[in-house]
Amino acid sequence: MGKKRIMFFASLLLITIFLSFSYAGITRESPLSIGKTLSSSNGVYELGFFSFNNSQNQYVGIWFKGIIPRVVVWVANREKPVTDSAANLTISSNGSLLLFNENHSVVWSIGETFASNGSRAELTDNGNLVVIDNNSGRTLWESFEHFGDTMLPFSNLMYNLATGEKRVLTSWKSHTDPSPGDFTVQITPQVPSQACTMRGSKTYWRSGPWAKTRFTGIPVMDDTYTSPFSLQQDTNGSGSFTYFERNFKLSYIMITSEGSLKIFQHNGMDWELNFEAPENSCDIYGFCGPFGICVMSVPPKCKCFKGFVPKSIEEWKRGNWTDGCVRHTELHCQGNTNGKTVNGFYHVANIKPPDFYEFASFVDAEGCYQICLHNCSCLAFAYINGIGCLMWNQDLMDAVQFSAGGEILSIRLASSELGGNKRNKIIVASIVSLSLFVILAFAAFCFLRYKVKHTVSAKISKIASKEAWNNDLEPQDVSGLKFFEMNTIQTATDNFSLSNKLGQGGFGSVYKGKLQDGKEIAVKRLSSSSGQGKEEFMNEIVLISKLQHKNLVRILGCCIEGEERLLVYEFLLNKSLDTFLFDSRKRLEIDWPKRFNIIEGIARGLHYLHRDSCLRVIHRDLKVSNILLDEKMNPKISDFGLARMYQGTEYQDNTRRVAGTLGYMAPEYAWTGMFSEKSDIYSFGVILLEIITGEKISRFSYGRQGKTLLAYAWESWCESGGIDLLDKDVADSCHPLEVERCVQIGLLCVQHQPADRPNTMELLSMLTTTSDLTSPKQPTFVVHTRDEESLSQGLITVNEMTQSVILGR
């Protein structure tokens, strides 16, 4: 009896200690005091009081729970520490969050009051401290909108020119003083935007302009870079920069008291520094002054652009380059406007684009050159992949030349700076050319007789392709697109032999080929009976030639000859996802980590189409057979014949010609022809469930009632969280919680109402964090009828081929 009483009191003591040191939330009745902490639901972050070096100054802050040494990512009272042990953080009668000292004076507050009968403060697993209305569940205030020196995944920097609102990082004064320091980090309202570290009102470091998935002034961010960032700007004068992180890793971005912008990631044992800027002298803003280039060498050094000389030779010799350079020969622009060329452009490679650029929309590379040439105030231009045309009308400031990467900058110079006496060069070149012509004329004539038939045929083929494009297919800007000759394609594919056939879809066959230079290609040969006409063919060429992302297939060119229409793509070794997923042997090659990587890659590609691409694209035919895999099993979205371009951030339209693949089509699209971004989200949800189960939606039938894949997924999620949906061949390689989360995300994507489905930003957040998910509702397309001879859906028939359905008005 005595032992039982001792155990009872010991248990009671442990419970009391636990309750006294860890809170589920802060309320008016349950404040947070010194010595107690508030943890996020999964124990990722912790909120509490802390001090530096056993100082009496106490701060309320958020840090990573269980990681030593402590990394504080947010401080509430950064300017006003408390010095007494009776301080506490609590909810006031008007719903505000307040920090009181022992005299019950307010030391810090969120600065807002709410017409709320009750509220509480909670800490999310994203590290966001939120004040929530108890009645409506609405978030009244959040720390993610009030930054300190640190940015966590899924928080965002932003600006709004209309309201004047701006969200920035502000450094600490020192590593033991969290009060505001000298440095801030912000995104600029320029188009395109760039990230800048400011020292007071002066720029200290800048990233270079944003190019869809990368900052052009950071050389490690090349075209193959997998970006954890997203930057959105709209026409109303607002923009936001969001930081993601993959695979549930702990990470953060911070600005130090010395002005160093750093990105850290935890490897399970320690923090790794993944990025730092400025890293050397060339990163310091304007290090070489106007029209100077900082050459990224060891040590860094300054030089002037061609056609420019140091403004002060003496200062330049002393190593003081901030005065920069001045033009050696003045420009005379009048001649360029009346047809006589007196100025030209000198091209410099591997350059970080200078500051003070201006964006010219809807201009191709040639147009960019022509506009700058005929504008006397245009000093330079660059046509940048992912941006388009940038021009400079002011001094070229903060230019850096990298050893690799960077952009090509074209600088306007007087013609005399571009290579000496042009007339003498022309005369010499003419004499040499004439001599060579006389010597080679006879040999060329003989050779021409032999080659003329082949050459004429090839030219006719190439001209036919271009004329068909120009006259028949209503040309659009496809700069950089190559027109292949028909005989080149026939040779590469061995005249479209069956041994080179990779597969066949609704719009024709796909063949493997090899060009004369050894490059492997995939050729899509459109069938005349496929139903893909001029519009779809042009659509696919225009779209893919402009879209560039690691998770989208890349088009190399096309061929148009007579009735033949061919598209030439990069060849991907592992073909399409369905060849692995639905093959009993090959499916063993894609374990759960690879499947999750494929899921995430498709989501990133879709996010690029919907939000990060300047065209804004709805795919309309997303399915497993349109997901191609490279040699590393990275997914690439393909087949843009049915895709639609749109402007703005949200889009909805309807069509009389409903084209897509039944089973992957959203209900509103299949029934009424209405499509939007959420139509693609529905298709993604179906693909996600197929990847989890290894089952094809058009072939799946479960139980005596013949349940569809969606019906079975819903039933499994309701009964077991969805873990029994997983393909048994990959069960040993999975994390059960990750699988259950993916099942729930898949069901959220296939909701009947488009408004209930997530957008791509929310989708990426769901896949890459452990934040709470909303519960899905029962999806549509779950009722099957079954007789002895056939199995058919009660609502709609599923077919593997892309279909077109004409709807009445």
From Swiss-Prot:
GO biological process: recognition of pollen
Signal peptide start-end: 1-24
Listed transmembrane segments: 426-446
Annotated S-S bridges: C282-C294, C288-C302, C368-C389, C372-C378
SUPFAM superfamilies (UniProt xref): alpha-D-mannose-specific plant lectins, Protein kinase-like (PK-like)
Sugar-modified residues: N53, N88, N94, N103, N117, N134, N236, N320, N375
PROSITE patterns for the chain: BULB_LECTIN, PAN, PROTEIN_KINASE_ATP, PROTEIN_KINASE_DOM, PROTEIN_KINASE_ST
Modified residues (Phosphothreonine): T655
Domain called Bulb-type lectin: residue spans: 25-144
Compartments it resides in: Cell membrane
Positions of post-translational Phosphoserine modification: S530, S545, S625, S638, S698, S792
Membrane topology: Single-pass type I membrane protein
Active site positions: D621 (proton acceptor)
Keyword annotations of the record: ATP-binding, Cell membrane, Disulfide bond, EGF-like domain, Glycoprotein, Kinase, Lectin, Membrane, Nucleotide-binding, Phosphoprotein, Receptor, Serine/threonine-protein kinase, Signal, Transferase, Transmembrane, Transmembrane helix
Region annotation CaM-binding: where it falls in the sequence: 585-602
GO cellular component annotations of the record: plasma membrane
Record's keyword annotation contains Transmembrane helix: yes
GO MF terms, alphabetically ordered: ATP binding; calmodulin binding; carbohydrate binding; protein serine kinase activity; protein serine/threonine kinase activity; ubiquitin protein ligase binding
Residue numbers binding ATP: L502, G503, Q504, G505, G506, F507, G508, S509, V510, K524
Extracellular compartment residues: 25-425
Family: Belongs to the protein kinase superfamily. Ser/Thr protein kinase family.
PANTHER family associated with the record: ATP BINDING _ PROTEIN KINASE, RECEPTOR-LIKE SERINE/THREONINE-PROTEIN KINASE SD1-8
Name listed for the protein in its UniProt record: G-type lectin S-receptor-like serine/threonine-protein kinase At1g61480
